[in-house]
């Protein structure tokens, strides 16, 4: 750490505190993520190892935050990242109204380029959300926080935890307890982020897992084996049933969005994971080639993080009161009225 001068605190993650720092010799500004080990015998946390491994696999992408160095420090170690001025959550929070169509296209295009690069290298991020999409001083968007990332097994045989992704961006298969999944979880999250940029607020702001499903059902309709055959194989499929609910046309949900935007959004927000449009295909969608064209990064808003104390983290969904099959349903809900329309009568 002697080669760096700490300039201030940026924030705090699951496994460490992040500082803004300056390299003493070169003057380069970086972000230092200090990871402390609770006990030396426990070794490096799995999330930190995953982040290092994932970033080493995809270090050549200009749309993924660059890991510059890893070095030991005290009873832990430090990750040195390129410094990014802000994040997409700050952009959305400070916007006085929904972003201009050209700005939405630009952010989404950069996000898709990063996701396409990750997926081409068999990396599934598993926690895409605006707070993990960092913005540089020049307006460049880069994907960060690979603590939940995994190297994807193309044969589909590996089992993973379903407790990944921040709830508002969590794919339906994860909400139904899927242990086998693929890049589709990232593509659903991209759709949620796109909808949030178009809407100015999250599309599916559930306060627990059941409310999250209800938010999705309210727009996309009740999933059925006819539309999504694999749903019957998911662990939590029969733990709660919902009344039949017809989908709401996306043009009613986002009346100001263009037909091209709604068409692309609809190809992300599909129940069957393998029917979701791939990131590489989405980049070729007509949405990006019709007026207005994507804005240049220099034309994008970059909210400055104020000096002094680090800004509070983007308010995400609370991770409490989750549904559990052995717990009375009314105890699992913060707002029981939200799901009442979906519960069968009798």
Swiss-Prot record:
PROSITE patterns: PROTEIN_KINASE_ATP, PROTEIN_KINASE_DOM, PROTEIN_KINASE_ST. ATP binds at residues 10-18, 33. It is an enzyme of class 2 (transferase). Belongs to the protein kinase superfamily. CMGC Ser/Thr protein kinase family. CDC2/CDKX subfamily. One of its GO terms (cellular component) is Golgi apparatus. Involved in cell growth. Activates CDK2, a kinase involved in the control of the cell cycle, by phosphorylating residue 'Thr-160'. Required for high-level Shh responses in the developing neural tube. Together with TBC1D32, controls the structure of the primary cilium by coordinating assembly of the ciliary membrane and axoneme, allowing GLI2 to be properly activated in response to SHH signaling. It is found in: Nucleus; Cytoplasm; Cell projection, Cilium. Residues 303-318 have a biased composition (Pro residues). GO terms for molecular function: ATP binding; cyclin-dependent protein serine/threonine kinase activity; protein serine kinase activity; protein serine/threonine kinase activity. Monomer. Interacts with MAK. Interacts with TBC1D32. Its EC number is 2.7.11.22. Keywords: ATP-binding, Cell cycle, Cell division, Cell projection, Cilium, Cytoplasm, Developmental protein, Kinase, Nucleotide-binding, Nucleus, Serine/threonine-protein kinase, Transferase. The active site is at residue 127. Residues 4-288 form the Protein kinase domain. Pfam families: Pkinase (PF00069). InterPro entries: CDK, CDK20-like_STKc, Kinase-like_dom_sf, Prot_kinase_dom, Protein_kinase_ATP_BS, Ser/Thr_kinase_AS. Its main location: nucleus. It catalyses: L-seryl-[protein] + ATP = O-phospho-L-seryl-[protein] + ADP + H(+); L-threonyl-[protein] + ATP = O-phospho-L-threonyl-[protein] + ADP + H(+). This is Cyclin-dependent kinase 20. Residues 298-324 are annotated as: Disordered. GO terms for biological process: cell division; embryonic brain development; embryonic camera-type eye development; embryonic skeletal system development; floor plate formation; negative regulation of smoothened signaling pathway; neural tube closure; positive regulation of cardiac muscle cell proliferation.
């Amino acid at each position: 750490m002697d080669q760096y001068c700490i300039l201030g605190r940026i924030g705090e993650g699951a496994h460490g505190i992040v500082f803004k720092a300056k390299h003493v010799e070169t003057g380069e500004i970086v972000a230092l993520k200090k990871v402390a080990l609770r006990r030396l015998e426990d070794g490096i946390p799995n999330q930190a190892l995953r982040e290092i491994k994932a970033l080493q696999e995809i270090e050549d992408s200009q749309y993924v935050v660059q890991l510059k160095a890893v070095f030991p420090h005290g009873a832990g170690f430090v990750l040195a990242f390129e410094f990014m001025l802000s994040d997409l959550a700050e952009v959305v929070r400070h916007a006085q109204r929904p972003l201009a169509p050209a700005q939405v296209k630009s952010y989404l295009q950069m996000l898709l380029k990063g996701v396409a690069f990750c997926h081409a290298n068999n990396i599934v991020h598993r926690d895409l959300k605006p707070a993990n999409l960092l913005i540089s001083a020049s307006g460049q968007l880069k994907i960060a926080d690979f603590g939940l990332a995994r190297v994807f097994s193309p044969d589909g045989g590996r089992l993973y935890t379903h407790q990944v992704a921040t709830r508002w961006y969590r794919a339906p298969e994860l909400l139904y307890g899927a242990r086998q999944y693929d890049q589709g979880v990232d593509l659903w999250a991209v759709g949620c982020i796109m909808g949030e940029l178009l809407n100015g607020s999250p599309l599916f702001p559930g306060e627990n897992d059941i409310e999250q499903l209800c938010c999705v059902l309210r727009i996309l309709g009740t999933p059925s084996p006819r539309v999504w055959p694999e749903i019957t194989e998911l662990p939590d499929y029969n733990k709660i049933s919902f009344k039949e609910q017809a989908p709401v046309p996306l043009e009613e949900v986002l009346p100001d969005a263009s037909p091209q935007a709604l068409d692309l959004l609809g190809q992300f927000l599909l129940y069957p994971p393998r029917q979701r449009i791939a990131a590489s295909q989405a980049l070729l969608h007509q949405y990006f080639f019709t007026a207005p064209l994507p804005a240049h990064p220099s034309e994008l808003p970059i909210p400055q993080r104020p000096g002094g104390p680090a800004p509070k983290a983007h308010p995400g969904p609370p991770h409490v009161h989750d549904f559990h099959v052995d717990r009375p349903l009314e105890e699992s809900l913060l707002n029981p009225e939200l799901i009442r329309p979906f519960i069968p009568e009798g």
